[in-house]
Amino acid sequence: METHPSLAVKWSCPDLTIYAGEVTIGEEDRNKMDSKKRKLEKTRITEAACALLNSGGGLIAMQMTNKSEHPVEMGQDLEKSLRELIMSPNMQAFFETKQQEDQFYIFVKSWSCRPEDGSTKPRICSLGSSLYCRSITSKVAMDSREAFEFLKDKKACIKYRPTDDGAPPAKIPRAMCQNSLESNPAFEIFQSKKLEYGQCLLFSESTSIEFKQFSTKHVQAYMKNIIPEYISAFANTQGGYLFIGVDDKRIILGCPKDNVDRDSLKTVANETISKVPVFHFCSSKDKDKVSYETRVIDVFQEGNLYGYLCVIKVEPFCCAVFSEAPISWMVDKEKGVYRLNTEEWVRMMVDFGPEASSKDLSKDFECQLSLCNSPPHCRPVYSKKGLQHKVDLQQRLFQVSPDCLKYTPESLWKELCSQHKRLKGLVKQQIRSFSCGLLILYRSWAVDLNLKEKQEVICDALLIAQNSPPILYTILGEQDEQGQDYCNHTAFTLKQKLVNTGGYTGRVCVMTKVLCLSSQNNIETNGGSVSPINYPSSYNLANIQEMQDLLQALVIVLLNFRSFLSDQLGCEILNLLTAQQYEILSKSLRKTRELFVHGLPGSGKTIIAMKIMEKIRNTFHCETDSILYICENQPLRDFIRAKRICQAVTRKTFMNYRFKTNSFQHIIVDEAQNFRTEDGNWYGKAKAISRRVKSCPGMFWIFLDYFQTSHLKESGLPDFSRQYPREELTQVVRNGDKIAEFLQKELQKIRDNPPCSIPRQSLNIVHEFKWSQSVSGNIKTEQFTLEDMVIYVADKCYDFLRKGYSLQDIAVLFSTDKEKKTYESMFLGEMRKRRRASEMNHAYLCDSNMFDSIRRFSGLERSIVFGINPIATEQPISHNLLLCLASRAMKHLYILYFSTPEGHSSTEAC
């Protein structure tokens, strides 16, 4: 990673600030400067602006070398450079300036690719693409917009280009163009062994031919300078020949042998070309190679060796060739200002999101934040269709009313005021000048932003008000010298997340103010903020619409989680929690040490379990080895273990006397309805571990769903009446409509005739069942002989794979682990036949991870689920087993029973 040598990141205020050193400001004074120094200053300012545009916006601070009592303009050269950077005459769209005494500031708004002038903009901002192409006889540098279109076309071309016999797409254009280059009139000269000084070539410059002279004695430096750009231009167009040693009149001059020798010419050319960066969209094995050939031809004068002509034949490249790494910068408080490498730059430029890789995504999910109009670091955000949109979530959680300043959540405000007598008066004094907006209170805003909690903080309050920038108030009981740093860091993180996660594209900086209950004099009492810099009024939220836009970005910041679809789609996307899930997650952990969460199938219990473990780490400043996650089955254990947020074990391992529990303080139990007591009292042991530090007991949260009970034995849970405090998750977010309808019917059957091991009171939750209706899904129930069933499943899997699904989308589940072991090899064998008989290269079909038992697969999900003869060995839980099976399927559910050949029957719902 290349860091900037002369740009420093400052920590003095809650914004991303780059200090650019001493700079001359003002047109008159800049015109008097030494041209080299003026250019260096301009480059430094432009690179700082590029870094901030690409990193969420911020502030460029500089010390004015020319003292002035009156405001001065920036300077025409600086303004022009910034306009060229954003490719727009409207500099005010991204920049504002302010002079304070001898300090000059440029306020930078985050870059976004939203088309403001009707033209498409690239995903990131760059000073130069380092991509070249040929235009008739010229080498042309592509600007960022042209580079974006070029890369987009290359990616699309590779994606849809046919191949012969499975050959990499890269091989086809290279072979096709070989004959074209050899038929070029320059090829005959390229093949020559000697030429005459002063000879006139019979062809001229063209798209595929360029003449350059050795016009300097510094031959090697000259070649290193020109070769990369021409290699890029020819390779990105149709290939061609670079003649070094021919003038514009087609006369061969060569390079005198006194200035260079033959071997060094070829070595310099080859070494220079070997350093040229390339990027592949295709599957070419020649990942780092430009295909070229260098010839050094002797040039004779009157029969004597005079010098050498260097000719480089360049073949067209399958993807993209650069002259050097693109010139694009980013900034981070930890890394400083750093330059993107070629791969990082290309991936950000052509990051179109998951729409291009999944046609079904738009059918099943609604886009909440798209990459096509958001800042560079944003990830796309989707919610399952039928769930609340970010606009609806904002209205429910953070509603803004005209001429009304509200405190939210009201219950927390009342609780805090009852605990701290001076709090109400102090806060009201701070915000008395605001009449429209919200004061959003948290015990710790830091925890909800994935930062460490500061225990001395009574609460944090975020003010979103009209005619004001956002202000974060940190309220302390006693004076604390670290309080302002905490507040600044929290505000800075919030601002960055509003832009880079929430997708907010307006101007924003979260101002800070630390208040102390014990102090008799909190100096600023008019709602102002502690900041050494006066921000422009454009950073104020001007009206309710701007407040709502910011609050919708805040909804994404607070409710997002990494979608399980990310791994399947090959790119990171985010989903949003439901309001019901968020309300459980936002509970104060210090006040809710123990909690039973009852959730209906597909309501997101495991998601909440993962999110709560992340919150535990930040609230209690603990490491992953202090948090223990316990479940019944190995697949769910492995899934959680891969997240690296805790130590994950099965209940059986937890109860093993060899298992050491000394380091654990917090315990999360998932799928607890399927626990057993055969190895001892797991509940008593877990509770004792979480309570062993009496002065600060740990967290003990239990997630369960009695409807998904898969056995009739004692679970070890306390009586239902003693499961308190208790919360419920009743909104199904996983399954398609037809599957959800099936779940509802099975839930009612269990409710009407429950197994004796399930407490009847726990089943009343079924009356609250609801799901998001809009994703269709389908269910099919069939009866087959074993032989026909194996063929049916293999055919269906093959069809799904041809439609673009992967093996990670499919699960084949058996009633018991014994049946899985008995029949798995038969299903695998039939699937391998399909692979061998087709052109599809699914070598990984040999992997058996898609096969499991219904019980072991508890807590996991797949788009497509086959249930193989789902008949419970214990009749009272037959509907529970069916419910467990169905709840694993998001879109397609196949319930397949064994029958005699004569007994085949079929029912379908779709």
Swiss-Prot record:
<dbReference type="InterPro" id="IPR031450">
    <property type="entry name" value="Poxin-SLFN/SLFN_N"/>
</dbReference>
<feature type="binding site">
    <location>
        <begin position="599"/>
        <end position="606"/>
    </location>
    <ligand>
        <name>ATP</name>
    </ligand>
</feature>
<dbReference type="InterPro" id="IPR029684">
    <property type="entry name" value="Schlafen"/>
</dbReference>
<feature type="active site">
    <location>
        <position position="205"/>
    </location>
</feature>
<keyword id="KW-0067">ATP-binding</keyword>
<dbReference type="GO" id="GO:0002376">
    <property type="term" value="P:immune system process"/>
</dbReference>
<dbReference type="InterPro" id="IPR007421">
    <property type="entry name" value="Schlafen_AlbA_2_dom"/>
</dbReference>
<feature type="binding site">
    <location>
        <position position="282"/>
    </location>
    <ligand>
        <name>Zn(2+)</name>
    </ligand>
</feature>
<keyword id="KW-0255">Endonuclease</keyword>
<dbReference type="InterPro" id="IPR038461">
    <property type="entry name" value="Schlafen_AlbA_2_dom_sf"/>
</dbReference>
<feature type="binding site">
    <location>
        <position position="319"/>
    </location>
    <ligand>
        <name>Zn(2+)</name>
    </ligand>
</feature>
<feature type="region of interest" description="N'-domain region">
    <location>
        <begin position="1"/>
        <end position="354"/>
    </location>
</feature>
<dbReference type="Pfam" id="PF21026">
    <property type="entry name" value="SLFN_GTPase-like"/>
</dbReference>
<comment type="similarity">
    <text>Belongs to the Schlafen family. Subgroup III subfamily.</text>
</comment>
<dbReference type="InterPro" id="IPR018647">
    <property type="entry name" value="SLFN_3-like_DNA/RNA_helicase"/>
</dbReference>
<dbReference type="GO" id="GO:0005524">
    <property type="term" value="F:ATP binding"/>
</dbReference>
<comment type="function">
    <text>Endoribonuclease that cleaves tRNAs and rRNAs. Cleaves tRNAs 11 nucleotides from the 3'-terminus at the acceptor stem. May be involved in immune system via regulation of inflammation.</text>
</comment>
<dbReference type="InterPro" id="IPR027417">
    <property type="entry name" value="P-loop_NTPase"/>
</dbReference>
<dbReference type="Pfam" id="PF13538">
    <property type="entry name" value="UvrD_C_2"/>
</dbReference>
<dbReference type="InterPro" id="IPR048729">
    <property type="entry name" value="SLFN_GTPase-like"/>
</dbReference>
<keyword id="KW-0547">Nucleotide-binding</keyword>
<dbReference type="GO" id="GO:0016078">
    <property type="term" value="P:tRNA decay"/>
</dbReference>
<dbReference type="GO" id="GO:0008270">
    <property type="term" value="F:zinc ion binding"/>
</dbReference>
<protein>
    <recommendedName>
        <fullName>Schlafen family member 8</fullName>
        <ecNumber>3.1.-.-</ecNumber>
    </recommendedName>
</protein>
<feature type="active site">
    <location>
        <position position="210"/>
    </location>
</feature>
<dbReference type="Pfam" id="PF17057">
    <property type="entry name" value="B3R"/>
</dbReference>
<dbReference type="GO" id="GO:0005737">
    <property type="term" value="C:cytoplasm"/>
</dbReference>
<dbReference type="InterPro" id="IPR027785">
    <property type="entry name" value="UvrD-like_helicase_C"/>
</dbReference>
<keyword id="KW-0378">Hydrolase</keyword>
<dbReference type="GO" id="GO:0004521">
    <property type="term" value="F:RNA endonuclease activity"/>
</dbReference>
<feature type="binding site">
    <location>
        <position position="280"/>
    </location>
    <ligand>
        <name>Zn(2+)</name>
    </ligand>
</feature>
<keyword id="KW-0963">Cytoplasm</keyword>
<keyword id="KW-0862">Zinc</keyword>
<keyword id="KW-0540">Nuclease</keyword>
<keyword id="KW-0460">Magnesium</keyword>
<keyword id="KW-0479">Metal-binding</keyword>
<dbReference type="Pfam" id="PF09848">
    <property type="entry name" value="SLFN-g3_helicase"/>
</dbReference>
<dbReference type="Pfam" id="PF04326">
    <property type="entry name" value="SLFN_AlbA_2"/>
</dbReference>
<dbReference type="GO" id="GO:0016075">
    <property type="term" value="P:rRNA catabolic process"/>
</dbReference>
<keyword id="KW-0391">Immunity</keyword>
